[in-house]
């Protein structure tokens, strides 16, 4: 699978808005639930890339039924509705929006599957302005650029330094 190219000259320093949070899409459902309930604020130093979800499909980010909603905020209420554990949604309706998250961090190949702009839009309308992943699917890079979402490849610790791919 082709990964987005990185332009080393495009490094920028970004800051988290005071009071906003970073959400980590971990492989551990309990850590996800605790973050969504506001019981846990993880840091990059707490996790390895192997602890993060890989191959997050756009169909999981916004299932087809969620895409029939017209208003972006309605689509955002169902962000990640396709991720289930024992046939139950891991992300309750509106949970990502209500969590006060501004950054979302995941593993390899985020956004694989169908080219679905609503996947990125659901994050953006949930308050996410920065997506960090070990790698992104090419279609997700294009959708993120179109939606004006800042993307960074490879989770990097310290000083808020992120590397931004160009689509």
Regions picked out by a protein language model, each given a short descriptive name:
Residues 1-167:
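Fe-S-dependent hydro-lyases/dehydratases of central metabolism
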